[in-house]
Structures are given as structure tokens and as C-alpha cells.
């Protein structure tokens, strides 16, 4: 009873702050923060070696299919045993790399591709499922999904999906476009692309990913007098300028003419939403 009273008291204590947070939700309070894992901050900018992502690129070309709704779907049901073996082999080869000895551009491409490979692998290994959130392999009584599970070891360190996103990519690169590159196997997530990310043209690829998502209805849209945005901007507002005005400025940077006009006319964000249904079927 005491714990329940404290929880209810905390909820009501937070109401004034939430009211000032515009479109932000209670769910945003539980979103992981950028918490740097200093071990992975090391790089060697003199190293010109490149990482081969051709196996992943081949998987993407064969199994990612654009839908009529502008959302890329993954053909999980079509992945044969030899394809799964190729994915497993790719994960093993990426895990064996001394990634801290590479330059930062190679590292960024590495972590993005590894995150997406692992996400596909974890769905294949635990499917069929209707949503990735049903893959309850993370430790902790209140945890759901696979994000807290140590999925592999890199340079002797156990690494989770949460580590890659929130302890490596977000804190060390501080680039909001990262959110458009990482795919969480859900319809509400930015598209899983048909090409692997490459250090040689990362900026172009990230810009395209940002433009594609923001100008799709699941990124931002004006509907029935409401400006509805992806929950990504609710959960990670700090990455997009820190407040509602910052999110709007970020959206305008990549928005097409119609969305810019809608943002300028409406002037605010009303609510956020997200579709956790799986981005494909078995």
C-alpha cells in the first residue's frame, strides 16, 4: 500500500510538468537516456581500413520490400536456413572486429548496421511474433522486448541493442538522424533500407532516411486539425532540440513543401503515436 501511495503521489506531482511539456507523454519519462559507455569512445582516425557489409546488403536487397503504403516490410517467411546461416556468420564476423581501432565514420556505419542485423536476427530466432515487444528475453521483471538482452560479445564486452543505441551511437555522435537509421522491426519505425549503411556516404544516407520518414504520415501529419508526430520525437525530445520548438525546427529542416506549410500554419504538436506491429510476417 505504501508503494502504491508513493507511485500515485509521484504521478500527481508530475502532472504540472507534463502539462508544460506540450505533446510529451508519461511514456517519455521511461525512455532511455543517452548514457555514454566510455570504453567505446576510442577510435583511430589514421586507420583507413573499411568494413565489408556486402553480406548484409545482399540480405536487405533480397528480403526488404516496399509496400504500397510507403513502409518497407521484411519478408521473414522467405528467409531460408542458408540465409539464417549467412546472418549468423555476419554477426560473428562483425563481433570479431577490433572496432575501437577503426575511424569514427567506419564505427558509425558498423554500429548502425550491427543494430539492424541483430534486430532481424532476434526476430527470426524468436518468431513468429506479431510484435517485437513479445520477445521477452530482456532481464528484469518489468522489462519487455529484446533490447536489454546481451546478444553478443565485442572485444570481450557483452553488448545489448540498448547499449548500441543509447550508450554508443546517441552519446558519442549526437546526431538526431541516428533515429532514422535504426530499425526496431515495427511499422511505426523508420524504414529498414534496401542498402547497408556505408562510411563513404553516411551523410547522404542519413539525410535520405530523415527526409523519407518525416514526410511519411507516421513521421508527421496534420489530421482532423491535429498535428500528429511519431513517438520518437516524444521519447527522445532532447535529441531533437530539447523541446517542442526544437522538434518543429528539426522537422522543418527535412520537411517537404506540404509539411512545412502545415507546420507553419498549425504552429504546434498535439500528440504522438507509434505502431508496434511487426514490419513483416512469418
Task: Cite the ranges covered by each PLM segment.
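Sec/Tat signal peptide C-region and signal peptidase I cleavage site
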Residues: 17-20
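Bacterial N-terminal signal peptides
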Residues: 5-15
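Interaction/scaffold regions that mediate signaling and macromolecular assembly across diverse proteins
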Residues: 22-112, 116-282
Amino acid at each position: 500500500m505504501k508503494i502504491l501511495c508513493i507511485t500515485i503521489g509521484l504521478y500527481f506531482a508530475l502532472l504540472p510538468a507534463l502539462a508544460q511539456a506540450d505533446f510529451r507523454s508519461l511514456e517519455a519519462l521511461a525512455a532511455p537516456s543517452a548514457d555514454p559507455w566510455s570504453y567505446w569512445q576510442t577510435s583511430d582516425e589514421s586507420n583507413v581500413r573499411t568494413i565489408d557489409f556486402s553480406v548484409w546488403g545482399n540480405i536487405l536487397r533480397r528480403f526488404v520490400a516496399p509496400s504500397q503504403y510507403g513502409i518497407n516490410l521484411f519478408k521473414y517467411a522467405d528467409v531460408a536456413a542458408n540465409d539464417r546461416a549467412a546472418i549468423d556468420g555476419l554477426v560473428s564476423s562483425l563481433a570479431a572486429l577490433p572496432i575501437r581501432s577503426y575511424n569514427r565514420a567506419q564505427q558509425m556505419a558498423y554500429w548502425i548496421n550491427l543494430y539492424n542485423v541483430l534486430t532481424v536476427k532476434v526476430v527470426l530466432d524468436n518468431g513468429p511474433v506479431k510484435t517485437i515487444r513479445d520477445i521477452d528475453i530482456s532481464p528484469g521483471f518489468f522489462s519487455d522486448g529484446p533490447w536489454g538482452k546481451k546478444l553478443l560479445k565485442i572485444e570481450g564486452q557483452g553488448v545489448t541493442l540498448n547499449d548500441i543505441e543509447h550508450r554508443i551511437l546517441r552519446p558519442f555522435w549526437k546526431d538526431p538522424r541516428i533515429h532514422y537509421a535504426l530499425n526496431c522491426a515495427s511499422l511505426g519505425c523508420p524504414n529498414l533500407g534496401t542498402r547497408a549503411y556505408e562510411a563513404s556516404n553516411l551523410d547522404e544516407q542519413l539525410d535520405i532516411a530523415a527526409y523519407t520518414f518525416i514526410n511519411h504520415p507516421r513521421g508527421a501529419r496534420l489530421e482532423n486539425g491535429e498535428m500528429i508526430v511519431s513517438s520518437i520525437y516524444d521519447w527522445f525530445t532532447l535529441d531533437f532540440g530539447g523541446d517542442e520548438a526544437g522538434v518543429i525546427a528539426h522537422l522543418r529542416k527535412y520537411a517537404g513543401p506540404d509539411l512545412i506549410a502545415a507546420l507553419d500554419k498549425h504552429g504546434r504538436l498535439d500528440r504522438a503515436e507509434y505502431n508496434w506491429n511487426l514490419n513483416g510476417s512469418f
